């Protein structure tokens, strides 16, 4: 209402006509360049005032449809991904981040992995009961399988691929491998996010240095974008991401058709191994 008063400083808002109010709303987007979310708030406020409070049965409200802001995901180049992975300080988090990037996994998916979810004979990672309750399989390179096998052999936890050492393991006098081996809980989301933030800050990529946020989910965006840039089918990429339709995958788009063999070849050449 404040902005409406500024646009019509000498008019009673209750005396404004339909066209005047609708033209004002359109000007917020086209002339003032306000964000779509801000314009939508103004639409809702004025609709409540004129339609619900004053009872104005204007037909023009149906014409005001402001699309939500569509922000493209933050994507690192391959070189930047390699720099990021090279800056991770602890081996267990390096294994997590490498797997997230190479397989496009959500944070919740990677920390929930069990050793048996890595099918070395078929070269796939099985994601069980992911978002939407769907299972899926994602190809994984032999080099990454060997790296994960070597990491697991350091702790040999029978239940979790990435177990949590638990709080106070250092003060208890345990070694990290022993703490991981005895753990009954998976690595926590917060510990992975903390390792991500520490690495981002160490690289100077945090918000204080003018970059958009780099988060765990950024690695999933990189996975999708780098596959599409290499010509892998959007249908395969959507399948690997676990999307229920192609629509959410289209945000990454620019692609040509390629076979799963091409996808495996591209994945084998991802940096970090």
Predicted regions and their residues:
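Conserved catalytic core of the tyrosine transesterase superfamily
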Residues: 1-273
